[in-house]
């Protein structure tokens, strides 16, 4: 599996509760926090849901 580098680039303030929960499930709690999960279908679905808040790169 490929690894992804996901960075939160926009604030979670004022977002829908399920979008905040999705970001927290990915481990993204603060702006500019970065995580490197495996590119599983579950993670890709979470990214698609909140892609307007993220910067995603393949590692």
From Swiss-Prot:
Pfam families: Ribosomal_L30 (PF00327). One of its GO terms (molecular function) is structural constituent of ribosome. Keywords: Ribonucleoprotein, Ribosomal protein. GO terms for cellular component: cytosolic large ribosomal subunit. SUPFAM superfamilies: Ribosomal protein L30p/L7e. The keyword rRNA-binding does not apply. PANTHER family: LARGE RIBOSOMAL SUBUNIT PROTEIN UL30M, MITOCHONDRIAL RIBOSOMAL PROTEIN L30. This is Large ribosomal subunit protein uL30. It comes from Clostridium beijerinckii (strain ATCC 51743 / NCIMB 8052). The gene is rpmD.
